[in-house]
Curated annotation (Swiss-Prot):
It comes from Burkholderia cenocepacia (strain HI2424). Keywords: FAD, Flavoprotein, NAD, Oxidoreductase. This is Oxygen-dependent choline dehydrogenase. Belongs to the GMC oxidoreductase family. Its EC number is 1.1.99.1, 1.2.1.8. One of its GO terms (cellular component) is membrane. Its cofactor is FAD. FAD binds at residues 7-36.
């Protein structure tokens, strides 16, 4: 057994861990060990580097933990996919590259919780900007010199993108030119974490590329964290496995758990921190009975509303193997063409009821009919809307199955457990149909493929959701910030009741944000990095942002085509 000592040990080189490793080692007298269970970020592997190849990493286990849920009781008892990234970059290495920060009111709502007063949107915005370099330049809402490359969709990529945005506006919803700017609500272009050369902008590329040459950072891949070590109530180190070899590293200052919403509570529980009764079931010595570890688990669930496309403008030909070498060659040589986009270049956020204070439904538009993981491709020209609710009241949990770090935990999201879930998904399907029947899509829209035009009643829509809805791959909130009985960490990520231990990743969100989670996770890590370093927080940015204040969710009077009567 080998033993080394560092100031900080970071468990997990994902979206948050890479931020911390980079920022902490900016101080040359600080030493950091970064442990990652997966392998390196192979820059010549098109599966992770080509934006259009985003489905490939989910189809194997090289880059994907490939978790599976327990049978979900409200989803026909399906065991559902729960992919998480494995390798330098974590889930930013395998995600869909959609750069969505969330709604300003997400963070203002966090700040109403005891102890989280400094997590308002205006407190968080400087850290979003610090992390970002946007290709069209900085402004009041966007950064111009950060590690993460953000590309904004440009007109003319595919006529279906503009048609779908126009259709949303024709249906009476707002248009917005920036889903991460003044107004998230509405339809418009999507920002994406893609470099100017058409490569995936993971946190391994953006952050670790600048930090890995520093002598005070050691990165160890294929290193699976087994347990956090404690000296009384103080975290003192980590034991980890590299194949059959066990090693121990000691932390002079802190252990930073950045393993994500599934693996972070799993590691804490395996180390004796979690619900005491759960730990005793596995004969794990209890360091601290902390009941919230693994509880409050949240995710976004989504479904695909799919249509036949009457004109040959979809990506259907790109799915054919004989067209892919040309696409790959253009991407490899020039960083351009179909391979250089994730093809989520338009989307939006809407409220389905006037009394919703901020958007409760998200759209990703895609100019092909296919599942996110590349399965179930429709054999024709088609297009689809990925649509799902944003703040489900349902709550799940992550529970340790065994003391073996190689065993996956028991995961239950408890999807669709509340009446509000069903109402929102029915509303979402019906709203999507109203959008799709607008004139902007007349020349493209063929028959509805899924759920199908005959699926109309509440009972029929519910059956479709139970059978076909899938994860949006946004697990979060399982080690939440706060000061209530189920909170795990404080506003700086410090684990309650223990010293020298923090959790910094999407698991500490108290409530899931409105949209994709990579950008908020990076922001959280940037913000807490300043706390760890003892730096003065970045000054609040005093900019306006849209608040509905009870305004109608949809201007039906201005809709080009009025709602169908059923």
């Amino acid at each position: 057994m080998t033993t080394r000592e560092y100031d900080y040990i970071i468990c997990g080189a994902g979206s948050a861990g890479n931020v911390l490793a980079t920022r902490l080692t900016e101080d040359p007298d600080v030493t950091v060990l970064l442990l990652e269970a997966g392998g390196p970020d192979y820059r010549f592997d098109f599966r992770t580097q080509m934006p259009a190849a985003l489905a490939y990493p989910l189809q194997g286990r090289r880059y994907n933990w490939a978790y599976e849920t327990d049978p979900e009781p409200h989803m026909d008892n399906r065991r559902m996919e729960c992919g998480r990234g494995k390798g330098l970059g974590g889930s930013s290495l395998i995600n869909g590259m959609c750069y969505i920060r969330g709604n300003a009111l997400d963070y203002d709502n966090w700040s109403t919780h005891k102890g989280l007063e400094n997590w308002t949107y205006l407190d968080c915005l400087p850290y979003f900007k610090k992390a970002e370099t946007r290709d069209v330049g900085p402004n009041d809402y966007h950064g111009g010199s950060g590690p993460v490359s953000v590309t904004t969709s440009k007109p003319g990529v595919n006529p279906l993108f503009e048609a779908m945005v126009d259709a949303g506006v024709q249906a009476g919803y707002p248009r917005t030119d920036d889903l991460n700017g003044y107004q998230q609500e509405g339809f418009g272009p999507m920002d994406r974490t893609v470099t100017p050369k058409g490569r995936r902008a993971s946190t391994a590329r953006g952050y670790l590329d600048q930090a890995k040459v520093r002598p005070n950072l050691e990165i160890v891949t294929h290193a699976l964290a087994d347990r956090i070590l404690f000296d009384g109530k103080r975290a003192s180190g980590v034991t980890y496995l590299r194949g059959s070899e066990r090693a121990t590293a000691h932390a002079r200052r802190e252990v930073l758990v950045c393993s994500g919403a599934i693996a972070s509570p799993q590691l804490l529980q395996r180390s004796g921190v979690g619900p005491g009764a759960w730990l005793k079931e596995l004969d794990i010595p209890v360091v601290l009975d902390l009941p919230g570890v693994g509880q409050n688990l949240q995710d976004h669930l989504e479904m695909y509303i799919q249509y036949e496309c009457k004109e040959p403008v979809s990506l259907y030909p790109a799915l054919k193997w004989w067209n892919q070498p040309k696409i790959g060659l253009e991407w490899m040589l020039n960083g351009t063409g179909l391979g250089a986009s994730n093809h989520f270049e338009a989307g939006g956020f809407i409220r389905t009821r006037d009394d919703d204070p901020w958007p409760n439904i998200q759209y990703h538009f895609l100019p092909v009919a296919i599942n996110y993981n590349g399965s179930n491709a429709i054999e024709m020209h088609g297009f689809q809307a990925h649509v799902g609710s944003m703040r489900s009241p349902s709550r799940g949990r992550v529970k340790l199955r065994s003391r073996d770090p190689n065993d996956h935990p028991s995961i239950l999201f408890n999807y669709m457990a509340e009446a509000l879930d069903w109402r929102e998904f029915r509303d979402a399907i019906r709203a999507t149909r109203e959008i799709m029947r607008q004139p902007a899509l007349d020349r493209y829209r063929g028959r509805e493929l899924n759920p199908g035009a005959d699926c109309k009643s509440d009972k029929e829509l519910d059956a479709f959701v139970r059978a076909r809805a899938e994860t949006a791959f946004h697990p979060s909130c399982s080690c939440k910030m706060g000061y209530d009985d189920m909170a795990v960490v404080d506003e700086e990520g410090r684990v309650h009741g223990l010293d020298g231990l923090r959790v910094v990743d999407a698991s500490i969100m108290p409530i899931i944000t409105t949209g994709n989670l990579n950008a908020p996770t990076i922001m959280i890590a940037e913000k807490i990095a300043d706390k760890i370093r003892g730096r003065t927080p970045l000054a609040r940015v005093d900019v306006p942002y849209f608040v509905a204040n009870g305004a109608p969710a949809r201007n039906v009077a201005k809709a080009v085509r009025q709602p169908e009567t059923v």
